Amino acid sequence: SRDQYDTVVVDAFGSGGSVPYQLTTDEFVAALHARLDARGVVAVNLASAIEGERGLLAQAMVATYKKHFEQVTLFQLDPGVDPAMAQSLMLVALRGSGAPSFASADPELRHYLARRWKGAVPEQDVLTDDFAPVDYFFNKAVF
């Protein structure tokens, strides 16, 4: 089908805890982007640091999503964790040209929006079907 979606959640882990590489590549993200409506949102659950060598997975995934989406943001599920340490993250990618508002009158929503990573994410190569060292990056993050 050629259905369009407003929201897609990618929450898949292979054996050992890593995201299957097929769900991280430029080709997958391009196909995902094509199936979202004009204001669509993708949320990706991943385990990685943000900074340093342990952050290679998150850095590469941010680079890959930025190739296709106007807005890409990371959220720390526990903002008290050192950004150089492995942690649970949510990558959120938005279609549309307008900058998102991370303000809300709802106190519970404000609590979650406050977990947005406001620092820079180091540059990394885009992941492709021919170059996706996801397991290597994941192992660097957690071991």
Walk through the language-model features, giving the residues of each.
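Conserved Class I S-adenosyl-L-methionine
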Residues: 29, 55-74
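Conserved class I S-adenosyl-L-methionine
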Residues: 46-58
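Conserved beta-strand signature within the Rossmann-like core of class I S-adenosyl-L-methionine
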Residues: 39-46
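Soluble small-group transferase modules, centered on the S-adenosyl donor enzyme superfamily
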Residues: 71-143
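A short glycine-rich, Lys/Arg-flanked "PGG" loop and its adjoining helix->strand segment in the class I
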Residues: 24-38
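A short acidic, Gly/Pro-enriched loop at the edge of an enzyme's catalytic core
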Residues: 1-9
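Glycine/threonine-rich flexible loop motifs
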Residues: 16-24
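Conserved NAD(P)H cofactor-binding loop of Rossmann-fold oxidoreductase domains
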Residues: 12-13
